[in-house]
Regions:
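Membrane-helix entry/capping segments
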Residues: 256-292, 314, 359-390
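Transmembrane alpha-helical interface segments in multi-pass membrane proteins
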Residues: 317-363, 387-390, 394, 398
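Hydrophobic secondary-structure segments that place a key small or acidic residue at a functional site
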Residues: 120-214
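"Rare, low-scoring activations can occur
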Residues: 158, 166, 191-286
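Hydrophobic alpha-helical transmembrane segments of multi-pass inner-membrane transport and secretion
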Residues: 4-31, 281-317, 344-354, 394-401
Length: 425
């Protein structure tokens, strides 16, 4: 009877531990899966070059350099000098904060099939200078075969040119190719109609977010728009290092003193990404969740191990007797492990039933909107099955760890005393 009650309590404890561990494993499954998805672009060895404009009150300000012809000429000189810097593999320019990858700025537009505006998709908008190689700087690739992309691959001479991504093609045109097709913003009836010149891989806004659709439009900045342009360079790994920034500033501070422009700031994309993650709470949220999940996981581990250690300890007499009659320790350990696994198997069906209720009431975070193809976390039966398999394996390992050490220390048996007759004579 006592053994039966003990088994019931162990099953109840395993049931609770299974449900808690399932929630923990599910979170990490989705988080790790999202981070493992391709970003669609890269930031390695990329630097952002920010140019400042002298105010009219500055003693170095020259009014003649502020007219439109001088501004356009200075803009071209800035691009040429960045391209010609030793070790620069590619240079790109884009307009405004929203065209700067991995920042807090966002400019969203809608794209729809010009022939059927009911088929539409929301995308991130980027305005790039087609005379620079913005797409190569950030290692964009073709959706069809994954080849690296260069901005010069597309016909930007067409004022209606636009380059989109795989998600736009799939959502707006289905299985058909989007290249050569017309798209427009369904929310802007008077807006222009664009012609798709190419389809790239979808891109992530943040590392832990899902890939999104994007649209790249050409901008040929006017004199008024030039001060808002941002510049990006990708450098050769051979020249990358802790001294690159100091060397660049030392050499280019004079070279980039063009007209009323000056070198304002040079920032690595590693720093930009880290600052963005911190300002948006991504770093803090991830660390807090990791700490809470680690604490919860440690408690589950200690709870289950403690229960089985206590269970084995209460049977030390039985274990010692079996060892005394010749049972090897490996056989005893195997029996204890089998008992633990059997108890886990008994708790599993009820745990699955409870978890299914949580899923049905919407307890899980299920992604919405347009998702990548074959996105596992959105396939609930598959996600439910995989997470529970991982949870079961995790608890099985914990049980094996819990039952393994105790049989190595059987109780000491006291030597029996000899009985004899006492001579009272």
């Amino acid at each position: 009877m006592n053994r039966w009650r003990s088994n019931v309590w162990v099953c109840v404890e395993l049931l609770l531990a299974f449900c808690l561990a399932w929630y923990m494993v599910d979170y990490f499954f989705v988080e790790i899966y999202n981070r493992s998805l391709p970003s669609g672009r890269g930031y390695a060895n990329v630097w952002q070059v920010e140019m400042g404009l002298l105010p009219e009150t500055s003693p170095d300000y020259r009014a003649a350099e502020s007219d439109s012809i001088a501004m356009l000429g200075n803009y071209e000189r800035i691009k040429d000098r960045l391209r010609d810097y030793p070790g620069v593999q590619a240079m790109g320019a884009a307009s405004g904060c929203y065209s700067t990858p991995y920042t807090g700025c966002y400019y969203g537009i809608g794209l729809a099939n010009a022939a059927d505006t009911s088929k539409r998709e929301a995308v991130m908008r980027y305005e790039i200078d087609p005379t620079t190689d913005f797409l190569s700087v950030f290692n964009h690739s073709y959706a069809k075969d994954g080849r690296p992309v260069s901005t010069s691959d597309f016909d930007w001479g067409d004022p209606r040119a636009i380059v989109t991504t795989r998600m736009v093609e799939r959502k707006v045109f289905g299985e058909a190719s989007a290249v050569g097709r017309e798209v427009k913003d369904p929310f802007d009836e008077e807006g222009p109609t664009y012609i798709v010149k190419g389809v790239l891989e979808d891109i992530k806004r943040f590392d832990n977010s899902l890939p999104q659709g994007a649209a790249f439009l050409a901008i040929r900045p006017s004199a008024e728009e030039i001060p808002e342009m941002n510049y990006f360079i990708r450098i050769d790994p051979a020249v990358a290092g802790p001294r690159f920034a100091d060397t660049f500033r030392e050499k280019m501070s004079r070279e980039l003193r063009v007209g009323n422009f000056y070198l304002k700031r040079l920032t690595s994309y590693e720093r930009i990404k880290a600052d963005t993650d911190y300002s948006f709470g991504i770093t803090y949220d991830y660390r807090v969740r990791m700490a809470l999940m680690a604490f919860l996981g440690l408690n589950i581990l200690l709870c289950v191990m403690g229960t089985f250690w206590y269970r084995v300890r209460m049977r030390r007499g039985e274990i010692g007797l079996r060892m005394a009659i010749g049972s090897p320790r490996e056989e005893i350990r195997s029996q204890m492990a089998r008992e633990g696994i059997c108890l886990l198997l008994m708790a599993t069906p009820l745990a699955l039933l409870i978890e299914a209720q949580f899923v049905m009431v919407g307890f899980l975070d299920i992604p919405k909107g347009t998702l990548p193809e074959h996105y596992w976390p959105a396939i609930l039966p598959l996600r439910f099955l995989l997470v529970n398999i991982l949870t079961w394996i995790l608890l099985a390992i914990v049980i094996l760890l819990a039952v393994w050490p105790p049989p190595a220390r059987p109780p000491r048996w006291s030597r029996p005393r000899r009985c004899g007759m006492t001579d009272n004579r």
